Each structure stands twice: as structure tokens, then as C-alpha cells.
Amino acid sequence: MPTPRGCSGPCHFLAPAFVLLLLPALSGSGAVPSMVVREVQESKSPKPGPHTLSPLPPGPTAAQPRGQAQSDAAGLPGAESRNDSIPGAGSEADGLEGKAGEGSQGGSLAVSPSPGDKPMTQRALTVLVVVSAAVLVYFVVRTVRMRRRNRKTRRYGVLDTNIENMELTPLEQDDEDDDNTLFDANHPRR
């Protein structure tokens, strides 16, 4: 069954996928309110009540002060320059880090996006890859279809030429040539 003129095979399936891919971008701007988006936002909001910090795993980081272990793990440049020989310097820094970490969940200072929230550049890259793949599929399908048509034309190539437009003119008679060709088929310009 032939497809309608305005709708090709791969585009018919890729259009809904493209719309689904753009839904998170639209919902972030407030253009598409949905129950799923609201539920996700409610589950991400911090719950009221006391927050407890998880204990440190046993190992080399347990012997170090909490602030130094976190900065060493994060690879912060200020971690090497901290002076632990001054008695009050380490405890003051630890106290400040503890106070700053109380408001955040898990006690971490760095704000990292959750796996569900994709940065805008990653969304743009995903859309670009999907559109490029759709264009690639379109041209591959188009090339395959064109080759099928060309094979049919080549198979009946002799019948396809227009005989009415062909002129048969006699060749000049040369005694030197042993050519047995009597007529030359010339195609006039169309």
C-alpha cells in the first residue's frame, strides 16, 4: 500500500519520538504542566525534619577530619595548603563545613544534578544526534528506493528509449573501411 505523499516511513515514526524527547525541555520552561513532572518535583523537595549524616566508611578517610577527606576526594587545590599544625585552624574549618553542610541533604557541599535532570547542553546534544540520525535514515531509505527504480529502468532500457526521436542516417561509403555498418543511430538533442 503506498504511503501518503506528505508522510514518509521513517519520519512517521521519528516525529513522536522527537516530541517525547523535547517534553523534558518544555516542562522545565513551564510550557507543559503534567502530573509526572509535579510528582518528580515533589519527590525531590527536601522533607522537613532532622537530617542525619551517614557514617564514614572504614578506611583511610575515617582517620582524617571530615572536611579534609571531602576536599581530598574532590581534589580541591586548597586541601594541600591547609595548615594542620595550628591547633584552632582545623577545628574552625571543620565547624564551618559542618554548618554549611547541615542545610543540604547528605552533607555534601557540591550541588550535583540528579540523574533525571539533564543539563541543557546534554539535551541539545541529544536532540542534535536524534535529528542527524533521522536525516541519515531518510537519505539511506531514499537511496535504496531510487536504486530500485533505476534497476527497473535498466532492465527495460531498450524499450525505454524513444524510437521516434531517433534518426537513422546512412554512413558515408568509404572503400578503405571494411565496416559492415549500414546505419548510424543519432539521438537528436531533446
Swiss-Prot record:
Keywords: Glycoprotein, Membrane, Signal, Transmembrane, Transmembrane helix. Glycans are attached at N83. It is a single-pass type I membrane protein. GO terms for cellular component: membrane. Residues 172-181 have a biased composition (Acidic residues). The chain crosses the membrane at residues 124-144. Residues 32-123 are extracellular. Residues 145-190 are cytoplasmic. Its main location: membrane. Residues 1-31 form the signal peptide. Belongs to the FAM174 family. This is Membrane protein FAM174A. It comes from Mus musculus.
